[in-house]
């Protein structure tokens, strides 16, 4: 009886394997398995995040790309205008901007493990939601899972760049705090309120960190769109199988 059972089992497995081979040979649609969807989505996320982090982590990854270059907030224009009036002032301002972007580039080099942790923990349900979601579904998943940890990675590096001296022993942060402190005193006074002046509440290092992360996720979204729409961007068989179906 046991021999008959194992013989039938062997025949069944052989038939299944042959059927799969025939379906693949003649390009007959084979439904995606849960394993394929999960593996394909994890690979897509790995490719997308590696590409984004590598590009932004290179010299001028942020600084040389106008789409993601991190600039001082609009409220800092008065600082920029005043420093620009002194000899060499424009270079001082641009040096600050460059240092901020260099800090973001350094942080991007270390973003990989943060993304990999989120990718590793992705469930089957997450995978199907991403597969059947919009063109930014994978990016949105990563944003939700990694943003706080990435903020903690980027923020200290940007904070350090802001604490460096720019002119006369004064750092960007000190100039910012002095400027906004004086402005807010006026804005919050009776005369300021009568004139409808608004206090500046921008936390400079937090603002710049958010801008850096906006750029990172923009690049990931671009890569996701490519993988979904362009067969050339599907660099291996599992991506072709999942996104080509």
Task: Please provide the spans of the model-predicted regions.
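Bacterial signal peptide processing site
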Residues: 17-20
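Positively charged n-region of N-terminal signal peptides that target proteins for export
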Residues: 1-4
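N-terminal Sec/ER secretory leader and immediately downstream segment
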Residues: 22-104
């Amino acid at each position: 009886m046991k021999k008959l059972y194992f013989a039938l089992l062997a025949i069944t497995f052989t038939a299944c394997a042959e059927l799969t081979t025939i379906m693949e040979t003649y390009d007959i649609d084979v439904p995606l398995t849960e394993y394929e969807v999960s593996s394909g989505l994890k690979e897509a996320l790995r490719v997308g995040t590696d590409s984004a982090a590598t590009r932004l982590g290179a010299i001028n990854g942020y600084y040389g790309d106008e789409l993601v270059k991190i600039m001082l907030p609009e409220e800092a224009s008065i600082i920029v205008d005043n420093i620009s009036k002194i000899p060499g002032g424009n270079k001082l301002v641009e040096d600050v901007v460059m240092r901020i972007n260099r800090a973001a580039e350094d942080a991007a080099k270390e973003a990989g493990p943060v993304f990999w942790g989120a990718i590793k923990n992705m469930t089957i349900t997450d995978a199907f939601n991403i597969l059947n979601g919009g063109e930014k579904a994978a990016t949105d998943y990563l944003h939700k899972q990694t943003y706080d940890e990435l903020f903690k990675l980027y923020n200290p590096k940007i904070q350090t760049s802001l604490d460096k001296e720019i002119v006369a022993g004064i750092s960007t942060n000190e100039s910012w705090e002095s400027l906004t402190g004086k402005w807010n005193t006026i804005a919050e006074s009776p005369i300021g309120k009568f004139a409808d002046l608004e206090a500046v509440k921008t936390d400079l290092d937090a603002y710049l960190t958010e801008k850096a992360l906006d750029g990172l996720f923009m690049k990931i979204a671009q890569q996701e769109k490519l993988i979904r729409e362009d067969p050339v961007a599907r660099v291996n068989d599992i991506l072709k199988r999942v996104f080509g179906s």
